[in-house]
């Protein structure tokens, strides 16, 4: 059975992610206590269910502490993927304020609402932190709902076994993605933004590609990043990781980082000798995907 566990900080978009799994034909369960997870899987096995997505209820901290060992047991007989959704505290406070909902871990009403909410968010972060290391982490701080759904759909194309390498472009002016394991700063490269013709375009467009591919520094940067990843990739595989996020950032996340993510991702996808290692590759463009349409 393919088991997809959705966890993360309340307000980070778990319901949106679960609906994306449901739209893809998965059996879905929301707000399931950890103590019932193994019983649920046994029941679904009896019903010949092949794909399930479960959003975990984090309100019982003692049960959450048992989740890593439960996942280890499930992985003996099933394919298990953990998706961890995160967002910065300011974004979470704003989302809870807009929806007027209480945080699941809110404490006493004697404190002010903002203090109670922030304390609840911090407490939940501490409870769930051990899960992040074995999860595919997505920072939804600047990510609209339609983009999160799209990212989940891309994730479903990925085999739930082996190491998944995510190449992600971003803009430093909006901050480094919290899920990044490796960060490469390419702001030192010539910027197409200063060309009036190229400014409204992106690194996906042919004129920008033609501009950047002729610059020796861009070619050198691309080669250096590839060589670094090729050197250390076997060590990340040996470490038993499920996910490795390589974030490449320029100023706005529109031209240089997008171009390099595409180029580097294409390079690794073309390496036939990596097939035996069960590697999966995803590429994302955070700022290009972050055009607001629907709030989480």
From Swiss-Prot:
Entry-linked PANTHER family: RNASE ADAPTER PROTEIN RAPZ
Keywords annotated in UniProt: ATP-binding, GTP-binding, Nucleotide-binding
Role noted for this protein: Displays ATPase and GTPase activities.
Keyword GTP-binding: yes
Protein name: Nucleotide-binding protein Pnuc_1915
NCBIfam families assigned to the protein according to its UniProt record, in alphabetical order: PRK05416.1 (NF003828)
Molecular-function GO terms, alphabetical: ATP binding; GTP binding
InterPro entries assigned to the protein according to its UniProt record, in alphabetical order: P-loop_NTPase, RapZ-like, RapZ-like_N, RapZ_C
Binding sites annotated in the UniProt record for ATP: 8-15
Family: Belongs to the RapZ-like family.
Keyword match RNA-binding: no
Annotated GTP binding sites: 57-60
